[in-house]
């Protein structure tokens, strides 16, 4: 039994329609065109590659175990700590998942790190956001453990 999940910018919807529903304008109206283009390209053009790398079998794309955003009952999820990045092409999936967990009554703590992108955690010691996220995540995890 798992009572807490800690998620850093996860892919939460591999379904074949998912890249059509994410709006690049959600990243801000003042988003530099180059950044907007990269976000759009990652969300659309590379999605098939992402599915292949994570799932192997395209038949699993619509399985709720692979695509938790398709889940019918969010109450079965454990309390969740979610970290994502401002310019992450998966950010909107993360935010939708957080909303669904919250609506289902699941305790959830969400932090979006401004000014960074998918994979920022790999830059511990170089990006303040990576260092800050580790400290925040550990603190939140201990809070969750104390309340459990």
Predicted segments, located by residue:
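Alpha/beta-hydrolase superfamily serine-hydrolase fold, recognizing
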Residues: 1-148
């Amino acid at each position: 039994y798992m009572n807490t999940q800690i998620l850093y910018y996860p892919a939460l919807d591999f379904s074949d329609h998912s890249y059509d529903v994410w709006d690049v304008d959600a990243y801000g109206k003042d988003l530099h065109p180059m950044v907007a283009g990269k976000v759009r390209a990652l969300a659309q053009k590379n999605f098939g590659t992402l599915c292949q790398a994570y799932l192997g079998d395209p038949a699993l794309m619509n399985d709720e175990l692979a695509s938790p955003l398709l889940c019918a009952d969010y109450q079965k999820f454990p309390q969740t700590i979610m970290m994502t990045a401002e310019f992450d092409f998966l950010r909107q999936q993360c935010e939708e998942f957080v909303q669904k967990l919250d609506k289902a009554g699941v305790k959830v703590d969400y932090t979006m790190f401004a000014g960074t992108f998918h994979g920022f955690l790999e830059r511990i010691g170089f990006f303040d956001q990576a260092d800050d996220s580790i400290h925040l995540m550990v603190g939140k995890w201990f809070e969750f453990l104390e309340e459990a």
